[in-house]
Amino acid sequence: MIGAGPAALAIADSLCDRGLSVAALAPADPAAPWANTYGIWADEVDALGLAHLLAHRWSDTVSFFGPGGPAGSEPVRHGRDYGLFDKSALQRHWLERLGRGGLRWHRGEAAAIEHDAEASVVRTAAGEAITAALVVDASGHQPVFVRRGDDGPVAGQAAYGIVGRFSSPPIEPGRFVFMDYRADHLSEAERRSEPPTFLYAMDLGGGVFFVEETSLALAPAVPFSLLKQRLQRRLAQRGVAVLEALHEELCLFPMNPALPDPAQRVVGFGGAAAMVHPASGYLVGGLLRRAPDLADAIAAALAAGLRGENLSRAAWQGLWPASLRWKHAFFRFGLEKLMRFDEARLRHHFASFFSLPTAQWYGFLTNTLSPPELLAAMVRLYGLAPWDVRWGLMALQGREPALLARMLAGG
C-alpha cells in the first residue's frame, strides 16, 4: 500500500482487519499531522460507530440561497447534524489499529513498480525492493502509478479559508453554514460574469470561527487570490474584521476525473481512484464505507487463489462495481451542467435541491442512493425547479453529449 493519508490508512485498516499481511510505503512519517480539515454529515459517522472521533458537532445547520439583503437572507434549515473530524484523533485511531494489526511501515518514495504473472515489486528511490501480491496506490489525487482516462479538462474545487478570531461573529454563534451563496457584496456585473462562490463556515467555540470561500468546481479552478478577495469583501460587507488568523487553509482537489482503467495491475483507492464525489466534493465518508468492500474483494480473491491480473481485476470490480460506475458518470454529467450556471441560476438550483425530502438530498450528497433512487430524486428535482434551471438542465453544450453517452453506456 502506497501512502499515509486518510485513504491509505482506511484501506490498510480494512485489509489488516481481514487478517491479510500488509506493508505500507510512505515518503514521510505516517504520524505527521494532516493539513486539511475533514467535514462530514454526522449520520455517516454515527452509522459507523465513529462519532467519538468528531471534534465538533452542530445541530443548527443551514444554507443561504437568496440574493442577500434584508429580503433575501432567509436560511434553509437542513435538520441534519454536521461534524468536523478531530484530525489527530482519526489519524491516531487508524495508526493504533494498524499497529495491532501488524502493518509493516517502510519509509521511502516509490520509484517504479514491476509486475510478473504472480506478484509485483515496488522499488523505492533508495533501492529497496518490496514484493507483494497486489499494490494499492492511495497516494492522493495525483498518483504516479494509476492510469486514468483523459476526456477533457478536470475541474477543481478550490477554497481559501481562515480559522481565527473576528471583531464580531461572522456567522450566528453555534451554527454551521454549509453553503451561503448570497452575493450582495458583489456588483451586478460580477454576479453575471464571474464564477459563483459560496461561504462554508462554522463556529468552533471559544470565540474562534472557520470561514472559507469556496468554488464548487471550475476548469481551470478559481484562483486562491480571487477566493481570498471574495472572502474579505464578504466579511467587510457584514462589518466583520479579522482580529487574529490562527490558521490559513488553501484547498484544491480534482472533482471530476475520469475513472481509472480497471485493466491495470496497480489498484487505486481514494483520490488516486477518482473516489471524490463529482457533484459534492465529499471523500472521507466514501473512504469509510468503501474500504471494507475493496478489502473483502481482495481477501476473497486471494483466498480463491487469484494472482496477477486476475487479482487486480477482482479488486477493481470490488471498488467500482457497475452501479457505482454509472453513478459516477451521472454525477460528472450533472457537475458539467452546474459549472455552466451563473450565480442566480445556481442559487435557484440549490434552493430546489434542498427542498427535496431530506433522505433524497442527503443520499445524493453522500452517494448512498441506489441508481433507481437517484433517478427518482432527479425527476422530482426537475419538477421542483424553476424554468431557468430546467432550461439549463435540458440544453446540451460542450462535452455534455459525450458525458451523457458515457452515462447511458453504463459509465
Feature-to-residue mapping (PLM):
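Glycine-rich Rossmann-fold phosphate-binding loop(s) that bind the pyrophosphate
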Residues: 3-6
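A conserved beta-strand/loop capping segment in the N-terminal third of enzymes
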Residues: 42-109, 113-118
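Flavin-binding catalytic cores
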Residues: 219-249, 267, 289-319
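N-terminal FAD cofactor-binding segment of flavoenzymes
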Residues: 10-68
